[in-house]
Structures are given as C-alpha cells and as structure tokens.
C-alpha cells in the first residue's frame, strides 16, 4: 500500500492502456448522469485486477450545500477540497487532472488550464474555509497534517 506522505509514494500504478497514477495525484472518476467526480488519491492498495484507492473528494460549486441555503460564489473552474473520503476501485478512474491548490488571493497564471482550489468544503458544518486557514485544523486533524504539508509544499514550490 502506498500512502500520501510515504517516501515511496512516487511509485506509479500503471494501467495496461498506459495510464499512470500516483498517490497525491488528482484524477477524474467515472460517474453516472453527472460530470465526472474529482478526487485526490490518498493511497493505492495494489491487488490482483484493479487496486483499491482511498480518495478525498473535491466538490464542484453546484454540489456544495452551505448553511441557511447560502449560494456559493465561485470562479468558473473553482472546486473545493473536502474531508469526505471513500475507498473505490481503480476501475472508476478516467484520467489524471490538474488542480492548482492556491493561497487566498493568488490567481492561476494566464494560459494554465486547470481546476483551482482555494477553499475547503466542511461537509459536516456546511461552510467553506480557505486552504491556509488554521481554524479548521481541529475539525479533521486525523486527515489534515499530511494534506496541509502536501498542499503548502505545492503552493510554495509550484506557484
């Protein structure tokens, strides 16, 4: 099993058709009658046939339900990281996708085609937090340390 934060997490899982996925990748996942789901691959457990994946889901604005029916004001390509995780079969993987995890106020450079994630969707409390807010760390401290390290490293190194 390969988990986010492990030293061997850069080892890819290769499909026979040439697709390649790693822990820490974002990908599109097959869905029925709706746009593909977007997920952050947290671990891959290799098994015979298709491996199992642990995925943290990223939500599109239309899927975010806030308190008191407040409407989400979001950029056209904005998505929201969440603490919602599931195990799923790799058979549902479509292909990798780009997600730029950015600090509040940082814009995606012109010419870059990507989803953008500035905020976290707290499903239980039905609210949004900025990725760099410290207030929500106690909400799901069992998930956040590796993710925050990964995201802050990405923000500092890639943007």
Label each PLM-derived region with a short phrase.
Residues 34-47, 54:
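Short beta-strand-centered aromatic/proline hotspots
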Residues 1-18, 47-149, 156-159:
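Epigenetic mark-reader domains in eukaryotic nuclear proteins
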């Amino acid at each position: 099993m390969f988990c986010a934060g492990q030293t061997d997490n850069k080892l890819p899982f290769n499909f026979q058709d040439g697709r390649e996925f790693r822990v820490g990748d974002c990908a599109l996942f097959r869905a029925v009658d709706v746009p593909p789901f977007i997920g952050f691959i947290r671990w891959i457990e290799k098994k015979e046939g298709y491996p199992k994946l642990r995925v943290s889901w990223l939500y599109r604005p239309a899927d975010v339900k806030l308190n008191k029916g407040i409407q989400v004001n979001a950029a056209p390509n904005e998505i929201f990281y969440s603490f919602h995780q599931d195990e799923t079969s790799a058979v549902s993987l479509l292909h990798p996708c780009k997600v730029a995890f950015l600090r509040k106020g940082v814009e995606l450079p012109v010419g870059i085609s990507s989803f953008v994630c500035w905020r976290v969707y707290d499903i239980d409390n039905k609210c949004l937090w900025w990725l760099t807010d410290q207030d929500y760390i106690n909400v799901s401290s069992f998930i956040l340390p590796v993710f925050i390290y990964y995201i802050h490293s990405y923000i500092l190194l890639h943007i």
